[in-house]
Amino acid sequence: MVDALRDYVAAFILAGLDPHIGSELEFFAPSVDYFGARNVSREKVERDLVRYDERWPVRRFWLDGGIIVQRRTGTSIEFVFPLRYELRNGSKHASGKVMKSLSLIAGGDNEMQIVAVNESKAR
């Protein structure tokens, strides 16, 4: 399970680097709790990802530690992981580390989908 979770996180991080927004969007369920907002539609998530891509066209993300499983049931799992980032847009840049939290459920085809995402600054 740990290897599968690490592979999932790696694929999610790589999708966040892809200039094609659809790559990352495919990970999300049709409705998600999105950075504190409840029941956000996939269309709103897509608009947010487009804005983020426009604001930070050059970005790097990488896993910076272990994945911590917080809760697991038969069809769902909640976990957190440390994520480092470097963002750039011309002369503007930002970098740091966040603790990213994801909640996943198994979809109809047994593919895991994100139903909640959030993050907080890591110390």
Regions found by a protein language model. Give the residues of each.
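Short, low-complexity N-terminal intrinsically disordered segments enriched in polar/charged residues
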Residues: 1-18, 26-30
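A mature extracytoplasmic/lumenal domain signature
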Residues: 28-31, 38-39, 67, 81-85, ...
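Acidic surface patches and DE-rich sequence motifs
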Residues: 29, 87-89, 107
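Surface-exposed, charged secondary-structure patches
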Residues: 50-94
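Short beta-strand edge/turn micro-motifs at domain boundaries
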Residues: 94-123
